[in-house]
UniProtKB/Swiss-Prot annotation:
Belongs to the SlyX family. This is Protein SlyX homolog. HAMAP family: SlyX. The gene is slyX.
Length: 70
């Protein structure tokens, strides 16, 4: 009988440990999801800024002088 009680107690401890682990993993997942959403927002903002940059086309006949360090 004591063996069964010890087994039950051990199982209860394992379940409690697993519940704690699941809770910690859930918190980490929520934090990562928030970070991912922020990074997606920031990336979208950067993409929009890059699209706004006026890049001259390669069709220009002007030859740019070399940079001063040459």
């Amino acid at each position: 009988m004591q063996h069964i009680e010890a087994d039950i107690e051990q199982l209860q401890m394992k379940v409690a440990f697993q519940e704690d682990t699941i809770e910690e993993l859930n918190k980490a997942l929520i934090k990562q999801q928030k970070q991912l959403e922020l990074l997606e927002f920031q990336l979208s903002h950067v993409i929009n800024k890059v699209k706004e940059i006026d890049v001259p086309s390669g069709d220009s006949q002007e030859v740019e002088p070399p940079p001063p360090h040459y």
